[in-house]
A protein has these predicted regions:
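Conserved "landmark" site that anchors the functional core of diverse proteins
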Residues: 1-325
Length: 325
């Protein structure tokens, strides 16, 4: 049985997302989109008994106020947004039965930055290029291509769901209220355009997340980069500035160096361009980016490709039924 959720207040930027997002269209310029903190999102779907690909809501910084038309089971994971159900505290990381007519109200994120709401049965919006994920900049996917707006109605595929299920404490991402984050990076693909002392400076320095950051890119503020000789002695086709290079594809998670400004290219980033990418943040570390806030400090730890793959397998191993009690 289908049900509707009425959007009383949309929140700061609440969007429909699904896992793993819109893959297979990178060469056409469509990024994967999908949940920024995939770990928290996947656990929310498991809690309510949804399929892994079921669509849910990503709530950024300040969550929405939603009224449910019918009985359902919901779960809220990720950032702590001090949510209430009809005025009573709503538990995080737990599946909860909601009765028709009840209202879920969220506040500002007090710990972390993004929370995820799963509803039994999953949110029903049209698939675009194989996914329901919202790609804001192109107006693709989600509910009418954009973040939720006050007064809209969200369709849900009604599902039974089981209330009273909790994610085990040691199976959740460790979202803290501190301002310091250790972020893993893989060196490359354009690390040879940076001098060795420049690479060491990057790894040994603190980098501040700027307020001008979103699901397209995370702008960082820190010391100046030191370029290798090849960055200055290159051919004219590569561009004038040492950070310029002949247009090429960008890996998701690459740290794109635009002049002296590093920008981490995340879920909704461009697929190609003419700037170098000396490091790449692996997907298994994206949950840390998703849960950090402007002015937080990053320190980067270099890992190998094999270590990054092992990190991803570790998260995959926690996004399973055995993580529920």
């Amino acid at each position: 049985m289908a049900l509707n959720i009425d959007v009383i207040k949309a929140g700061l930027e609440t969007s429909v997302q699904d896992f793993p997002g819109r893959y297979g269209f990178w060469e056409q310029g469509f990024p994967p989109s999908g949940p920024f903190d995939m770990w928290s999102f996947r656990l929310a779907n498991i809690l309510v008994g949804n399929a892994p690909e079921a669509a849910g809501l990503e709530c950024q910084f300040m969550g929405p106020t939603l009224k449910f038309s019918d009985d359902c089971v919901i779960a809220f994971t990720g950032a702590e947004m001090n949510a209430t159900l009809d005025g009573e505290t709503f538990p995080m990381w737990e599946s909860v039965a909601v009765a028709a007519g009840q209202t879920l109200a969220c506040g500002f994120a007090s710990v972390g930055a993004r929370a995820y709401l799963a509803v039994s049965g999953g949110i029903e919006v049209p698939q675009v290029l194989g996914a329901r994920a919202t790609f804001h900049m192109a107006g693709v996917g989600g509910l009418e291509g954009h973040a939720l707006k006050d007064g809209q109605s969200i369709a849900v595929n009604g599902g039974a769901g089981v209330p009273g299920r909790k994610v085990k404490q040691d199976c959740r991402p460790k979202i803290a209220n501190g301002k310091q984050w250790q972020i893993e990076v893989v060196q490359g693909p354009n690390d040879d355009w940076i001098a060795e002392e420049g690479i060491e400076r990057f790894l040994e320095s603190e980098w501040k997340l700027q307020a001008r950051s979103n699901r397209t890119g995370y702008r960082l503020e820190g010391p100046e980069w030191i370029f290798a000789d090849k960055a200055s002695s290159k051919g004219p086709e590569h561009g004038e500035h040492p950070s310029n290079i002949l247009d090429h594809g960008y890996p998701v998670g690459s740290i794109n160096l635009c002049g002296q400004t590093p920008i981490i290219l995340v879920n909704d980033a461009p697929s190609a361009g003419g700037f170098i990418n000396p490091f790449t943040v692996p997907s298994a570390a994206f949950w840390k980016l998703a849960q950090s806030k402007p002015n937080d400090i990053y320190r980067f730890n270099r890992v190998s490709v094999e270590e990054a793959q092992e990190m991803r397998r570790g998260i995959d191993g926690l996004c399973v039924e055995d993580s529920i009690e």
